[in-house]
């Protein structure tokens, strides 16, 4: 069996990334305060269809993801179909793979094209940290069920008397891993300590990310991939990411206190991605259908891989496991790549993965390889800035990375690019794209 991955349909058509689009990414409770992930998802898909001048009725499948699920609309994909003028018979379903969610939705649509089931599909993801499901305590939830079944006033009163005042308090969504009880920030701290990632190096990476993102926006490179979003009550709009420190100075980072280990920690708010609202999407087609419709795709999927590791230690090391799989399936080595886009969940996590890419010991002990994945050339790495600057709406980051690297490669005249991300649950994702 060949190690190479054939990302084509039966006719030999490649999977074309026709275009990609996203909303601006906004910090929690700012520009998108009160706007749900569903509304942002409909917003970006509608705008992408409009810009591509594609009849919505031609979309055969939509796979969309969300991490912070809303009980009122658990199948965000189906609701987007119903709210964007697509045929009501359009196949639509939702996925969730933590921070790798829109990598998963992209792969699902790509595989539908590869099998010949469809020719045209949309993938993406959206998340809101400003509109979240607020829960109730376990005791109150139990009591509410019992109250629904109670028949007499006396039975109902007895149930209510079991509750204390603290049982009535709202319960916000959990930020910790279900399996371990550890937050992502605590895991980033663990990785910083384990791999001797200094505070200064974390600050420097964050400063680099914000500085490059500022340069990218000022150069106009994101205009074609970020829409202007008009938000209710439609008296204002946002057309630029609002987390970027446009006047970033390295000295300013040193003033911040550690966020997760106050006494001995090195991870700060500035070296962590903030809670963010946003949505993104990509339009995928078989190569022949894209060309028949007159499109010049921004890229093609060359290979992809997912990985999973233990959650108790190094949980955010996913890129170091998924990347060698994607490279092997593409028949490539790290040095063959033109650009590398790695999700910067935390500066510490990013630097730890970069360190492991170049580690022969890690390759031998964890990957069963006789050579390291490869040393990362910083002239190829996150050249437009990364998630530390842009922000991280969990389900939207994957398709943000894919679109961004494809368009940057297009500006440079073509080449190959790696996109990779860690994700909660010890998950990892990697996708290699090629651009002509």
UniProtKB/Swiss-Prot annotation:
GO MF annotation: an example: acetyl-CoA C-acyltransferase activity
Pfam families named in the record: Thiolase_C, Thiolase_N
Keyword annotations: Acyltransferase, Cytoplasm, Fatty acid metabolism, Lipid degradation, Lipid metabolism, Transferase
EC number: 2.3.1.16
Keyword Electron transport: no
Residue numbers annotated as active site: 99, 392, 422
Similarity comment: Belongs to the thiolase-like superfamily. Thiolase family.
Name assigned to this protein: 3-ketoacyl-CoA thiolase
Organism of this sequence: Shewanella sediminis (strain HAW-EB3)
